Regions:
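Canonical Radical SAM [4Fe-4S] cluster-binding loop centered on the CxxxCxxC motif
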Residues: 2-41
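Radical SAM enzyme core and accessory elements
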Residues: 226-276
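Active-site proximal loops enriched in glycine and acidic residues that flank catalytic Cys/His/Asp
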Residues: 10-12, 22-25, 32, 49, ...
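Catalytic cores of alpha/beta
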Residues: 165-181
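Short acidic (Asp/Glu) and glycine-rich catalytic loops that position anionic groups and cofactors
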Residues: 25-29, 54-59, 152-158, 174, ...
Length: 276
């Protein structure tokens, strides 16, 4: 955790249209006129990792799901990394569920360890589907233990508060579901579940930013200057650039704080009351 995290990028642009994302397919087309994503070749991506490895013994985050282009892209990349003898710890990103075959391939490639970043954003399938993430809770629940069984050393899972069609109860349930997810893995498995506000700003260029009323949002900032002024506020709640039909800024803040003891209690049980 004390080492710097370096990054390599699989792609410029994206094939996915997550409503809240300023790097979505919609945002890239609308803001930078990119009609389709431009993928770095698997061989060049592996070369990027080799260059970092030659200078630093530090974790390397591969930005973008390796399978976004195709399964063949991921296989070519992993083979190239094996041929180059990648030794650094590697962090992969998931945009949907994954299975044993993929994780086994990752595990035999990165012998010195690998971990996962996965952002479902909500446990609520309705909320997630509206955002543009159509995979099921079952896919998430199967992915996590499978990853650990195949050698994953750490799994970071991210939920947010303040999403379209997400009311207070739905937001709280994302914390409650942590108990089920932690119960699905062994005590020694490092599953970290984060639950935080969609903050501080709605991504400029995202579908929500460009059409806020369509998504049930009221924005408090549109221009750069308006966003700068929000940063002068005394608390993070007042920095938020939005409210939704389902949750006010007060709701987002209250829910965020109410989840803390719930998540603390569950994580303490998961870790056998060891210090977090």
């Amino acid at each position: 955790d004390k080492l710097p995290l370096t990054s390599v990028f699989t792609v410029r642009g994206c094939t996915i249209n997550c409503a809240e994302c300023g790097g979505s397919h919609f945002a890239n087309g609308n803001v930078v006129c990119r009609k389709k994503p431009a993928f770095r070749s698997p061989e060049k991506l592996a070369e990027d990792i080799s260059v970092i490895q030659s200078y630093l013994d530090t974790p390397i985050f591969i930005v973008g799901d390796l399978r976004q282009h195709s399964a063949g892209y991921a296989q070519r990349f992993l083979k190239e990394c094996r041929d180059r003898g990648v030794k650094n710890h590697v962090v992969i990103e998931l945009f949907n569920g994954a299975g044993m075959e993929y994780f086994n391939d990752v595990d035999r490639t990165f012998e010195n360890g690998w971990s996962i970043e996965f952002s479902p954003d909500s446990h609520d399938e309705k909320v997630r589907s509206v955002l543009g993430k159509g995979y099921t809770n079952q896919a998430i629940e199967q992915t996590i233990p499978t990853a650990f069984e195949c050698g994953c050393s750490r799994f970071d899972l991210f939920y947010m508060n303040g999403l379209p069609y997400q009311d207070r109860e739905s937001a709280m349930d994302s914390a409650r579901v942590a108990k089920k997810l932690w119960a699905s893995v062994k005590q020694e498995d490092k599953l970290f579940i984060y639950n935080a506000p969609f903050a501080p700003f709605v991504d400029p260029g995202s579908r929500i930013f460009e059409n806020p009323s369509e998504w049930g949002y009221t924005l408090r900032a549109r221009t750069l200057e308006e966003h700068r002024r929000l940063l002068d506020n005394p608390s993070w709640k007042h920095v938020l650039s939005y409210e939704t039909k389902w949750m006010s800024r007060d709701d987002v803040a209250e829910i965020s704080y109410n989840k803390i003891p719930m998540l603390d209690a569950e994580s303490a049980m998961k870790l056998g009351n060891r210090k977090l």
